[in-house]
């Protein structure tokens, strides 16, 4: 079952890559984030309990870092420029 899920995800990502290359587009940050979220959910479903705790902690840490980078740092830089 797990092999079939991974194989279908790999095929799906390959089809997406072909569609992007035909349209002369590349993956955007939002596309990559969606792919990582989907793969993270699949890994969480099929992982043992100890590994699940590590993965959830890592995902929360990366989410905090991403939102800090996207929202808090620009506010801080804008306040430095205004002074």
UniProtKB/Swiss-Prot annotation:
Location(s) in or outside the cell: Cell membrane
Transmembrane parts of this sequence: 5-22, 32-49, 56-78
Pfam families: DUF5510
Membrane topology classification: Multi-pass membrane protein
Any single GO CC term annotated in Swiss-Prot or TrEMBL for this entry: plasma membrane
InterPro entries associated with the record: DUF5510
Keyword Cell membrane part of the UniProt annotation: yes
This protein's name: Uncharacterized protein RP098
Protein species of origin: Rickettsia prowazekii (strain Madrid E)
Lineage: Bacteria, Pseudomonadati, Pseudomonadota, Alphaproteobacteria, Rickettsiales
